Amino acid sequence: MATCSAYLCCPATSASLKKRVFPDGSAGFLFFGGRRLSNRLVTPKSVIRADLNSMVSDMSTNAPKGLFPPEPEHYRGPKLKVAIIGAGLAGMSTAVELLDQGHEVDIYESRTFIGGKVGSFVDKRGNHIEMGLHVFFGCYNNLFRLMKKVGAEKNLLVKEHTHTFVNKGGEIGELDFRFPVGAPLHGINAFLSTNQLKTYDKARNAVALALSPVVRALVDPDGALQQIRDLDSVSFSDWFMSKGGTRASIQRMWDPVAYALGFIDCDNISARCMLTIFALFATKTEASLLRMLKGSPDVYLSGPIKKYIIDKGGRFHLRWGCREVLYETSSDGSMYVSGLAMSKATQKKIVKADAYVAACVVPGIKRLVPQKWRELEFFGNIYKLIGVPVVTVQLRYNGWVTELQDLERSRQSKRATGLDNLLYTPDADFSCFADLALASPEDYYIEGQGSLLQCVLTPGDPYMPLPNEEIIRRVSKQVLALFPSSQGLEVTWSSVVKIGQSLYREGPGKDPFRPDQKTPVENFFLAGSYTKQDYIDSMEGATLSGRQASAYICDAGEQLLALRKKIAAAELNEISKGVSLSDELSLV
């Protein structure tokens, strides 16, 4: 693997320069391809830290209490048998918490691989195919806690503390959070000094943010979060424009961010979703700091979690899908799950447990909920949530696409070079992308080959019906428009992954329909990033939902034991009736 992957390559070789005036009105020089020269002294970046012992936000203080719950008390109730449907991050998070409390856990997954939306697999040619592009904010304390617990704390690479925008023609804009003083001054400096917006737009942007609940978050994080929740009914665009923000700011900066967060633009995303992130960026210095996995999620995220679960006695059952949730109704009208009808190819079986957790995505839980349950408002609300289609494209090149400073260097294959970070763009159908050969080199850098761009097409709707060849053609054309210096480089391999419904559409007014992890059915629980938790639909939200689901199950330990005995007694009674009837028939 490329040993230089832990450095930001700043070649000192000659480059073509041209002077120009930037959108903010200032003048400066551009390297070939449009990259702006910083007026700071450029020095080689120190080795990137790959652990979670520093540069992580402390979400236990001066933060909304619900975002990072305290460690659970030691469970002293009865040992429970728990069946979890879904081996995504939410399901595995639930499993880890339950196993740590001494319960027995089985996880059922209909696919041949685990990880859900953060899953990956290896194709016949040895290429790692991901379900999407995964970036870890510095405020992902629940996910970082999980990674530490399972021994994966050294599997993340810290990126430069900037948010980079690639504009048409190779022009680079930045939100540069590198500043001697931390929050909130580092953020104020980043927004006031950004070259992604014109001076007027920056000023109006500052006014809008100054009038937001983000300011209150500095002194009253819980109060600010409630204010932000109250803004769920309006779109971010409507809120932002009402506070003096400009349409240009939305188009050039906030739309790419919104697409990256929720796969929809500012006109369609809830103000709650965007302001939740802004509040964290404003109050926590490292919240905006990005990390990416060393390599593929299956190896560096799902893999360690799976090993931990198995070592703790948990069991995975792959390719077992749930066909039906079986349930009974008590004489008092209450319902409980009596089993899960599972199938694997031609095999079928009924799975029984004390508690059942549906850790599914939105379309998955919709298929799973029995028709009768949908009459309840709790479950009926789920059908008011819909998922967003997304298409993830991987393009392997025979050179380094994002190398803007040195044309000759971009054509060589001996050393990885280019932009090592998450990249946003307002000028392509993919809102965010990264060169995984640089950003996650362990599995994606291949000696003798070049960039592996992973591009997330949002909205994915126009691309869903297109053949893969047409998608590749369109995306590679847009890559060339962003990086003219890549003219002449060839795509040597590609892949396309289409997901019909990924994250739930966090549009205005949808937050009240997110279900709690505890349901009206006594022994049936939910987990998933779409369920009710204080963060947005994300990896962090999925992990947090698993912690909350586990807490509900442990709190209900005694009741679930009583239900187990009740079900056993009812089954024994049915068997007794069957034996009595058999005896009567024998006498006849």
Swiss-Prot record:
One of its GO terms (molecular function) is 9,9'-di-cis-zeta-carotene desaturase activity. It catalyses: 9,9'-di-cis-zeta-carotene + 2 a quinone = 7,7',9,9'-tetra-cis-lycopene + 2 a quinol. It is found in: Plastid, Chloroplast; Plastid, Chromoplast. GO terms for biological process: carotenoid biosynthetic process. Its EC number is 1.3.5.6. Keywords: Carotenoid biosynthesis, Chloroplast, Chromoplast, Oxidoreductase, Plastid, Transit peptide. Its main location: plastid. PANTHER family: PROTOPORPHYRINOGEN OXIDASE, ZETA-CAROTENE DESATURASE, CHLOROPLASTIC_CHROMOPLASTIC. NCBIfam families: zeta_caro_desat. This is Zeta-carotene desaturase, chloroplastic/chromoplastic.
